Amino acid sequence: MSAALDSPSRSAASPRRSSVGIVLWAVFLAITVSQFHSPLFALPGRLQAWGSLWVAICVQALPFLVLGVLVSASIATFVPASFLGRMTPRNPFWAVPAAGAAGVALPGCECSSVPVAASLMRRGVSPAAALSFLLASPSLNPVVIVSTAVAFYGLPQMAWARFAAAVVAVLCAGWLWLIVGDNSTLAEHDERLGECTPSKPCAATAVAREEAFRDAALADFFPAASYLVVGAALAAAVKVIVPAQWFLGLADTPWLLIAVMVVLSIVLSLCSEADAFVAASFTAVSPTAQLVFLVVGPMVDFKLIAMQLGAFGRGFVLRFVPVVLLSAIASACVVGVVFFGGL
């Protein structure tokens, strides 16, 4: 979510021209056709099972992904970043939970929360509060919680556990940053993530806002959908190829199982509106391990790290990522024990 009335609209041309994205969608469509038993795309045995699971995960997750993108684009277009600045107390300690609450009220994709956080800092919001919003917006928004409830319809407490763990993680990360954060490492990128300028005017008219909304939605949707397709394919492959006994064998070493889910959440880089359906497909792992996957993913993944490097610099990432990762893992484990009775 960019602060549209405070920043230029994003172009969706690049994602749409991505050859990788085109190839991924072509493969996905081919697999979809195969589910209707087309002789042209017929798949044998386990490959058919993989294709069926891949399509099922994508079809379940896609409506929530679209809904999340539309909500994010609406806020990006019509809610100025200055509004968030006015909502945040001047006291940095209380600004952290206030920014977290703003993340619930103003949901957005994790990708788009990075420029919003940068804009908030430039408006005088404390870095800890701005970064708390960066974490809360994709983790605590209502679309994410509803999608989790749908994905885990047989385990309704998972949605509440995810919300509780994310709240704890956001607060811990924000307050820890007040203690260990080095704000001098934050890089200035005013032109790339900055204010309206004569060369980059704000969206002021209704037509401009409509174009900004469309561009913001497309710019969020295509990368997120590509990550969903790839993540669902890998999750389906794990489900089909890796024996359930392997995960069951890790039950005796729950920390190792949790480490596996942490790595998967970082590597897959899924959109938070869709990741619950991928997590639910890992039926052989414990609920707490699934919860760790759901909490870590929207806060720390490869695409977020890359965006934070560009927005804030290497020194910031080297401090911020460990703080967030430890907060997310610890909160998910503690909440998992409370809700599910163990790791």
Protein language model regions, located:
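Selected transmembrane alpha-helices and immediately adjacent juxtamembrane segments
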Residues: 2-3, 9-73, 160-262, 321-343
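N-terminal, well-ordered alpha-helical segments
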Residues: 52, 56, 69, 73, ...
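Short helix-loop boundary/capping segments at the starts of domains
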Residues: 56, 60-67, 75-76, 80, ...
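Membrane-embedded helical hairpins/re-entrant loop segments and their flanking transmembrane helices
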Residues: 71-102, 246-252, 278-279
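Membrane-interfacial helix-loop connectors
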Residues: 103-161, 242-316
